[in-house]
Amino acid sequence: MKQRILVAVVGVPALLGVLCFAPDWATMALIMALCIIGSHELLAAVLPPEKTRRWWGLAAALSVFVVADVYFRGEPFAGTPIQGLMPWLTAAQAVVVFICMVLEYGKKEEMDFTALCAILMAGVAIPMALTCLLRLRMLEHGAGLVLIPLVAAFMSDTMALFGGMLFGKTKLAPLVSPKKTREGAVSGLVGGMAGMILFRIFFFLCTEIQLHIGWCVLLG
């Protein structure tokens, strides 16, 4: 609980400051930093420590190139040399991963199939998911639209926590997560939908643009 409160007091305002008020390149830098940290966390979870130290830098570098590629594909960079160059640089970095796999074959810290999958997951799949925030930020009224996944996630998580604490009696999946309850799950679902309805109202007051209420509820 203390950790959640600390994140809410310190982390959330800092996150909102970067996403909503800083230039869109700051969002790119934030996502790059998250991908670098996430690369290490993922590899550390599935690989031995020696292989994690050996390969996480490669995964982190690939993730940075993927994020940069998405950023420079934006309309402000249309027709610029960097927009044409980034896909080739990203592809070259991906090729480097497979070259390393071949060169290190048979050695103690070789890149086996598990390591390759972890590197590609950390270097490609996760960055592609996180760059959805970047794509939202680069749209018109992106400073507001980028909050959609955050509002849905935070409201759902918060209501699931407090709903479970107040009303939770029936275990949801005790073998997977002993503290989760069905009442908490329902509270989270309701909280996410309610949060998105409130977001729709505030977004209209700020931009005079009406988001489709059905989509807002579905996203919640």
Residue ranges of predicted features:
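Membrane-embedded alpha-helical bundles of polytopic integral membrane proteins
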Residues: 1-217
